[in-house]
């Protein structure tokens, strides 16, 4: 089994080297959100409840040091459950999440409008990743039929972007990956996908949200960029989420402008 992102030490979670993100000596947003999603799911969720929405607030840089997770139920009813999660480091809250769970039931008859969307095909060599890669991503840019590993197809392009992702490392040592953790992880990629333009990636996200009408089936999650709007250094981006069967929900990310040389990924 691949090395996990975190090891357990008492009530703390100790980050490995692969938790570092592309914005300096701090954890990546997908790592922070993935761990919060893992902690919320571990707090005790009825399997008949659908994880319908997860919002992650990235309050400050999370250092490459041990963290603790705190969870609290804010609302629990017959058809709804709202759980908050907090990431604490050195006694300070560094990130938080809010997860909304809705009870599944009979689905109404009839058709409802939704825009027609298609994802590029799944990559054929998705098992070809390096031992030092935190996750697999296959990006598509100006040519949606010709992708490449990593984000090379996004470089200096203002075209619509797509990505297929595969999380293959456990979030926490000794605990298998779950569909909810995959959703929590991939939501952060929305920021890069939607805010990357002709000048490269010039925005860092302060949050992200994922919504899902059902859990993803399989290891692969896809993202199709839908919009980017920005004014005076503030931007909002939105994407549609896919699994191998089709659309499952949406994602969004709010972001702030950054210097051109601030984004320094070490693994893509």
Regions inferred by a protein language model and the residue ranges of each:
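Terminal targeting signals and extreme-terminal segments of soluble enzymes
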Residues: 1-268
